[in-house]
């Protein structure tokens, strides 16, 4: 099978979407490009176009693409492929052959758009929905008008001043003769009264604080009074309570030294540890010795 017959059979057996997409420049360029070596061989042999396959019987055959033939030209739908092969110059064949392999460059795009425009103008029923026809430009003025139609007109909206004037008579106080004359007639006065009642308890502690400050000032002038009301700044090191201290003092009066069993018993009664009871008795004995030494010195003097 020759190269020309191979490309021609591929062009006829392509699927419908591929055929529809490459009809304007693809198949035409392929058929023209494939015809170039055949024509050169004929010129070398000096023979006529007897070896060129004749596809004239296929030109009138309607394919599944709404009666559009793959071998017809866009300008002359009924013309055959053989005259087109003889009449096309060599440089134009090369140009279409390159545009077939590079479909996204300028020449292929121009031929495609020209085909769409001509087919849409001449035969509107053959225009396909999958063709890349340019979308119509959107009229911005029309869109804006439609958008404005969706929005209610500004003139129908009431102004804030009108709303205030309409609401004001409803909130006006009732006449004094009406039975509704109560605290609700003047809400501002009621709110002020309640705020004043809430602020009164806050003012009383402030007055007490002022009195305490005056007392401290008078106490500072009198040292005897200030000594009585003075608070010790020394941190307590002893964790014993008054009840625990009193019970330990009683136990110390009975016996200055405790046995281990008695120490554990006192610690359990007073909720203390054995070490705490032991330390307290040691400190208490040291204190008693100091007091005895002072008494002796006072007697000797």
Swiss-Prot record:
Biased composition (Basic residues): 93-103
Entry's Gene Ontology cellular component terms: nucleus
Spans annotated as Disordered: 33-120, 150-226
4Fe-4S as UniProt keyword: no
Any one GO molecular-function label of the UniProt entry: DNA-binding transcription factor activity, RNA polymerase II-specific
Keywords assigned: Developmental protein, DNA-binding, Homeobox, Nucleus, Transcription, Transcription regulation
Biased composition (Low complexity): 69-92, 173-182
Amino acid composition bias (Polar residues), ranges on this chain: 57-67
Basic and acidic residues bias spans: 183-216
Gene3D superfamilies on file: Homeodomain-like
InterPro entries per the UniProt record, alphabetical: Abd-B_homeobox_TF, HD, HD_metazoa, Homeobox_CS, Homeodomain-like_sf, HXA9/HXB9/HXC9
DNA-binding region, residue intervals: 233-292
Pfam families linked: Homeodomain
GO annotation terms (biological process): anterior/posterior pattern specification; embryonic skeletal system morphogenesis; proximal/distal pattern formation
Protein location: Nucleus
Primary location class: nucleus
Family, as annotated: Belongs to the Abd-B homeobox family.
Biological role stated in the UniProt entry: Sequence-specific transcription factor which is part of a developmental regulatory system that provides cells with specific positional identities on the anterior-posterior axis.
Annotated protein name in UniProt: Homeobox protein Hox-D9b
The gene coding this protein: hoxd9b
